[in-house]
Design a protein with these regions (language model features):
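N-terminal Rossmann-like NAD(P)+-binding domain of SDR-like oxidoreductases, especially those catalyzing
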Residues: 1-106, 150, 156, 160, ...
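C-terminal substrate-binding subdomain of Rossmann-fold SDR/epimerase-dehydratase oxidoreductases
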Residues: 111-266
Length: 266
């Protein structure tokens, strides 16, 4: 079993290094498939390609399924879409057992610190402990379908245990905005957060509106932003007998606990 998780996986960074992103996320997939074909390993291997909900981009349907049209809005999404289609192509042309998992956002305490969930939780924990004063965010109204990486890894494995290679959407089917996610974290940390202002002037306040701890920063907006992602994993639930064990509340609790542990250790 080959699980191709290798990628330049940051959407914002893909605008800065599009060629590198394409080389890793698109051509990297082709190289593995070519190796399977060249060494005549079609009967001995199963290949999993890590797709992404970012391929949907400017969503053409809500919620998104395996049949929803793709419309990526970043070099990352475009490169991943090549990986998706070349996997399908080699599956059909060379009978390679190749599957695409179209995974929506999945998080854990190990999430990279530049990704928004980790950034929010780490930033607010550090503010709680007096280590930082402010958290800077971009689009507060972007909506995502967040799940736990443990659930999604199980789904990846299940995909390659099937008799027939197919593609699957893996998602929770529940959606939250960056703003709501931030509110949830603040509540768990004991902050009485309130929002004031609009657009670039919007700020998050605590202490009955006396202290500003969150600001909107234009540097965290992308040239093109995906406003909404919401997955429909009905196929995975039926064919793989898969469903998520974790919800967003328990995921946030786990990530907060890890950040507090890191602060105490330092």
């Amino acid at each position: 079993e080959i699980y191709n998780l290798a990628a330049q996986s940051h959407v914002a960074v893909s605008f800065e290094v599009p060629e590198y992103t394409a080389n890793a996320d698109a051509l990297g997939v082709l190289r593995i498939l070519e190796a399977i074909k060249f060494h005549k390993l079609e009967k001995y291997t199963k290949f999993y390609q890590a797709g992404t909900s970012e391929m949907y981009g400017n969503v053409q349907q809500i919620p998104q399924t395996e049949k929803t049209d793709f419309y990526p809005l970043s070099p990352y999404g475009v490169a991943k879409l090549y990986g998706h289609w070349i996997t399908k192509n080699y599956r059909e042309a060379y009978n390679i057992f190749g599957c695409n998992g179209i995974l929506f956002n999945h998080e854990s305490p190990r999430r990279g610190e530049t990704f928004v969930t980790k950034k929010i939780i780490r930033g607010l924990v550090r503010i709680k402990f007096g280590l930082d004063k402010k958290l800077f965010l971009g689009n507060l109204d972007a909506k995502r379908d967040w799940g736990h990486a443990k659930d999604y890894i199980e789904a990846m494995w299940k995909i390659l245990q099937q008799k027939k290679p197919e593609d699957y959407v893996i998602a929770t089917g529940k959606q939250y905005s960056i703003r709501v996610f931030t509110n949830m974290v603040c509540k768990k940390l004991g902050f009485d957060l309130s929002w004031k202002g609009k657009g670039m002037n919007e700020k998050g306040f605590i202490n009955s509106g006396k202290r500003s701890i969150i600001e909107v920063d234009k540097d965290y907006f992308r040239p093109l932003d995906v406003n909404t992602l919401l997955g429909n994993a009905t196929k995975a639930r039926k064919k793989l007998k898969w469903k998520p064990k974790y919800n967003l509340n328990s995921l946030i609790d786990e990530m907060i606990s890890e950040e507090i542990k890191l602060v105490n250790e330092s």
